[in-house]
Swiss-Prot record:
NAD(+) binds at residues 28-48, 108-111, 248-250, 274-276, 294. It is an enzyme of class 2 (transferase). It comes from Leishmania major. This is NAD-dependent protein deacylase SIR2rp2. Binds 1 zinc ion per subunit. GO terms for molecular function: histone deacetylase activity, NAD-dependent; NAD+ binding; zinc ion binding. Pfam families: SIR2. Belongs to the sirtuin family. Class II subfamily. InterPro entries: DHS-like_NAD/FAD-binding_dom, NAD-dep_sirtuin_deacylases, Sirtuin, Sirtuin_cat_small_dom_sf, Sirtuin_class_II, Ssirtuin_cat_dom. The keyword Flavoprotein does not apply.
């Protein structure tokens, strides 16, 4: 049986067995690579690059030079996130959500593309439209935050990342043109491999309320997922899930793997669709090793919802 047929059968069986519940989906970076956003652990991911140096939450908070390094890199790399469009994975999940087949989406991604899917999925880089990446009626929990918002580390002032990008470019005229031309330096989560001279030349934008430092409103490496989010999402899996469907994630970080462990312990079926092995393969009820998560989801939606698979590649609102 084709992967889409296998997945459709799994979802239909779980739905019939667990009436009153719905599929809870956990998505990772493999759902967004087809939107042109690099990942960390894939075959061409960031961890395979020799020049990769991890920026941790602890480094960012204690070292002002690390803050300059982060924002220099982010200023140059944000264009991969700002204006990014959804791919077939996001659009198919939106259709599944509208149909009721998917009850909730938990995402490790910070790109906001699950929000954008509710607006038709077409990228929009205009500053006044940043809300398309941060706000929607999608039943969505962003485990690691959203790159399209920033927060002051001192007073908690909240600001759109698009506004900060504009102010960074005003504060650093010519910076983007001088240092941001090499696409091969693009990294995951709107990051960029900036040369040392770019970091040294970087002028930060400070909080307009207290003159404090801004931090992206995301969970950095070494930082914990906020406890209220963990508690709410664990309860959601326990009380609402007919099954747990993991898409495009290797499950290497515990903040994602915890849901697979929980589902397994509660007898909730687990399916994994990913390119390559994952941490949860040994306890999954179904594992599909695929080249394209988006293609499999589009074909699965065709089988279950009767929508032509080609529709999900057109990035428009799907009428069910």
């Amino acid at each position: 049986m084709r992967p889409a047929g296998t997945l459709a059968s799994f979802l239909e069986r779980c739905s019939a067995r667990k009436r009153g519940r719905g599929c809870v989906v956990l998505t990772g970076a493999g759902c967004s690579t087809e939107s042109g956003i690099p990942d960390y652990r894939g075959p061409n991911g960031q961890y395979h690059r020799a020049d990769f140096v991890l920026l941790t939450f602890q480094k960012f908070m204690r070292d002002d030079n690390e803050k300059r390094r982060y924002w220099a890199r982010s200023m140059l790399g944000y264009s991969t996130m700002c204006g990014a469009s959804c791919n077939a994975a996001h659009m198919a999940l939106q259709a599944f959500t509208k149909s009721g087949a998917v009850a909730h989406i938990l995402t490790q991604n910070v790109d906001g593309l699950h929000h954008l899917a509710t607006y038709g999925g077409v990228g929009d880089a205009e500053e006044e439209h940043y809300y398309k990446y941060t706000t929607s009626d999608a039943p969505l929990k962003e485990l690691h935050g959203n790159i399209h918002n920033v927060i002051c580390t001192s007073c908690g002032f909240f600001m759109p990342r698009a506004r900060l990008q504009r102010e960074l470019r005003e504060r650093n005229p010519g910076f983007y043109e001088q240092y941001g031309a090499d696409v091969s330096r693009t990294r995951p989560d709107g990051d960029y491999s900036a040369p040392t001279e770019a970091v040294n030349a970087m002028h930060l934008v400070m909080c307009p309320r207290c003159n404090g430092f801004f931090k992206p409103h995301v969970v950095l490496f070494g930082e914990n997922v906020p406890k209220p989010i963990v508690e709410a999402t664990m309860s959601l899996v326990r009380d609402k899930a007919s099954c747990l469907l993991c898409l495009g994630t290797s499950l290497q970080v515990y903040s994602a793997y915890r849901y697979v462990l929980q589902a397994n312990q509660l007898g909730i079926p687990v399916a994994i669709v990913n390119a390559g092995t994952t941490r949860g393969d040994a306890i999954a009820d179904l594992k599909l090793d695929v080249e394209s998560v988006g293609s499999v989801l589009a074909e699965t939606a065709h089988e279950m919802l009767g929508v032509p698979a080609s529709m999900f590649f057109r990035r428009k609102t799907i009428q069910l």
